[in-house]
A protein has these predicted regions:
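Class I S-adenosyl-L-methionine
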Residues: 1-17, 22-119, 222, 229, ...
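Signature of uroporphyrinogen-III synthase
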Residues: 8, 14-15, 52, 67-71, ...
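Conserved anion/nucleotide-ligand pocket segment
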Residues: 152-196
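A short alpha->loop->secondary-structure connector
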Residues: 107-110, 133-135, 186-192, 323-327, ...
Length: 490
């Protein structure tokens, strides 16, 4: 009989993917199979290891027990295959997450499990809106309720709820907001009680609607508030005026499309989100490591080593057999991000040009090398690195090695157009991304006209103009930070 696997019921937190716990991240990285649904940030899946099986079982809040039973059975099925299974659940597994039902099924089949708590939206979402669920002198307690009905004509005892002191929090209650407010007032709750509806909390799309308990349903409907949303009822809502912090961030409310490859795109998205912006990653490029083809023993033949991108650094050191093979070789780098990648390996570049151009790096390395020195350039298959011309011009022996390939990662035209509808800005950090983007749109760029297009530098701008795409702005320094600075000034 095959050995049973183990299941980790993991709370994925809410909205902001950095609200995932460290233990949750570890479980994800070690999983053979991950079963997830819609109520979580999909970028969390990026922490999974290579070869992980992903199973999406989306569960809208209108669907019933049939879907949950399907999920229960799938978890058991994968565990019985001997796999380490992570069941990812938005928020916390035991706060209206139906985690208990999944565990009952595991227990019936004698499958070992662990529960990893998650940050619940009942607390985190109000916090991001500047609303504390408890506050000295205002609220000594808070009470969390589901805003949905399990069965028709089956709901809460609002008489008891209306009598409670402290803050009332309803999850998944937008659809029943009018009923909730009416029932609370009917059973004695002050109609003037401050009430907040927080939509898409903890994300760059967060929106807060506030009014009295009596008027909140009408106001929310007027403002077209939709789920997912958290409803907070109580005097603590008044604290938002002073405690609101998230919506004051520089990029809050800005919807920004990132077009980089997945690895660098994730980093760029995080920088946007640190500043409160809402980023959407649509990777139009796929990076393919080629450093496994390099003979590191040949490094002893070179006097200098140049890197023109973080990817080149990463792949070079991923395969290096022994750091000592570098010997006394001089190292040059283009760009702050390339330098930062080198510093991860305790290496500081000997030269860095002020302008973030590979041609400038070729000139800079002349200062610390001599005629006829051999200089190795780790680059991509599409990088403008003319080693033959440089060798002739500078009396050095430049040799380039293609450390990685940059391939188009084409998307369907329909998918791209759908995502662009919600965007305000689109960022391009390479000519290749522009070409792949236009290819994906089948050369129909009409959907781009209303967007503010930001270019990283002259080469990318030239490519954008070639395809008749209007540029809103070009970065002053040709880096990802330069693009961020444009967004900050907007």
């Amino acid at each position: 009989m095959s050995k049973k696997g183990k299941v980790y019921i993991v709370g994925a937190g809410c909205g902001d993917f950095e609200l995932l716990t460290l233990k949750g991240k570890r479980c994800i990285s070690e999983a053979d199979c991950i079963i997830y649904d819609r109520l979580m940030n999909k970028r969390i899946l990026g922490f999974a290891g290579k070869g992980t099986e992903f199973i999406y079982l989306g569960k809208e809040n209108t669907e019933g027990g049939l879907i949950q039973e399907e999920i229960n059975n799938k978890i058991v099925e994968k565990a019985l295959e001997g796999k380490t299974v992570v069941r990812l659940k938005g928020g916390d597994p035991f706060v209206f997450g139906r985690g208990g039902e999944e565990i009952e099924k595991l227990s019936e089949n004698n499958i070992p499990f662990e529960i990893v708590p998650g940050i619940t939206s009942a607390i985190a979402v109000p916090e991001y809106a500047g609303i504390p669920v408890t506050h000295r002198g205002i609220s000594k307690s808070f009470h969390v309720f589901t805003g949905m009905t399990a069965k028709e004509n089956s709901f809460h005892d609002f008489k008891k709820i209306a009598e409670l002191e402290g803050t009332l929090v309803f999850l998944m209650g937008v659809k029943n907001l009018g009923l909730i407010a009416d029932e609370l007032i009917k059973h004695g709750k002050d109609k003037n009680t401050p009430t907040a509806v927080i939509e898409k909390g903890t994300t760059g799309k967060q929106r807060v609607v506030i009014d009295s308990l009596e008027k909140i349903s009408e106001t929310a409907e007027k403002e077209k508030a939709v789920s997912p949303a958290v409803i907070v009822i109580g005097d603590v809502v008044k604290k938002r005026e002073k405690f609101n912090w998230f919506e004051k961030k520089e990029l809050f409310g800005k919807n920004i499309l990132v077009t980089r490859d997945t690895a660098q795109g994730e980093v760029f998205c995080r920088e946007i989100e640190k500043l409160g912006g809402n980023s959407e990653l649509l990777s139009f490029l796929k990076i393919e490591d080629q450093m496994h083809n390099f003979n590191y023993e040949n490094l002893k033949n070179y006097q200098a080593l140049l890197f023109n991108s973080p990817n080149g650094v990463k792949f070079f050191f991923d395969h290096i057999p022994d750091m000592r093979v570098l010997g006394n070789i001089k190292i040059g780098a283009v760009g702050a991000k390339t330098r930062e990648e080198l510093e991860k390996f305790k290496i500081r570049p000997d030269v860095m040009p002020e302008k973030y151009l590979t041609t400038e790096l070729a000139e800079e390395i002349l200062k610390i090398t001599e005629e006829n020195d051999k200089i190795l350039v780790i680059t991509s298959d599409i990088s403008p690195c003319d080693d033959v011309e440089w060798s002739r011009k500078y009396n050095r022996k430049f040799e380039k090695f293609v450390g990685y390939n940059t391939n188009f990662n084409l998307k369907s035209k329909t998918d791209v157009e759908k995502i662009l509808k919600d965007m305000e800005y689109i960022t391009f950090l390479s000519s290749s991304a522009v070409k792949s983007f236009v290819n994906s749109l089948e050369n129909d760029i009409s959907c781009v006209k209303r967007l503010k297009v930001i270019s990283i530098g002259p080469s990318t701008t030239k490519t954008l103009k070639k395809f008749k795409i209007n540029i809103f702005s070009e970065a002053l320094d040709y880096t990802a930070d330069g693009v961020i600075n444009i967004l900050r000034k907007e």
